[in-house]
Amino acid sequence: LETVLKELNRVTQGYFNNGSYDTQLNGIINNYVDGVVLPTYKSLMEKNTILYNVVNTFKNNPDNDNFEAACEAWLKAREPWEKSEAFLFGPVDAKGLDPNMDSWPLDQVAIVQILKSGNYDDLDWTDGDSDDAIEAAQNVRGFHTLEFLLFKNGKPRRVN
């Protein structure tokens, strides 16, 4: 969260000219960051930690109860992400996290191929990769990929 605040200060620094309104603007920015941005990112971190743990519980004990818990955790984790999209700055912007977490449209065919092959290398990319390779990796991971795996037609899937 400290990184977000530093990035916000860096980005907004150019807008200040030590004029008569700077004190008012500082108050507005501090209120916005402290009251909206940081609590939203904190909630995002906490709810995604829960989601990660619940998905791992399902992985280790695949039954319908654990699957439904994963679906519920996904819904709760998604909410702060949606809110945070109103202010994509800080590390989310600077590190390009948005397309890695929320890429759309999905490449459903590639997702199924990865699952069938067990070759998870297609999920990764590095800075030296082509734009096409990066986009291909981004289109098979993140919130929408997990949504595709957990839900069908808006309803949780069932474990067979």
Question: Language-model features: where?
Answer:
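Mature extracytoplasmic or organellar-lumen-exposed domains after removal of signal/transit peptides
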Residues: 1-160
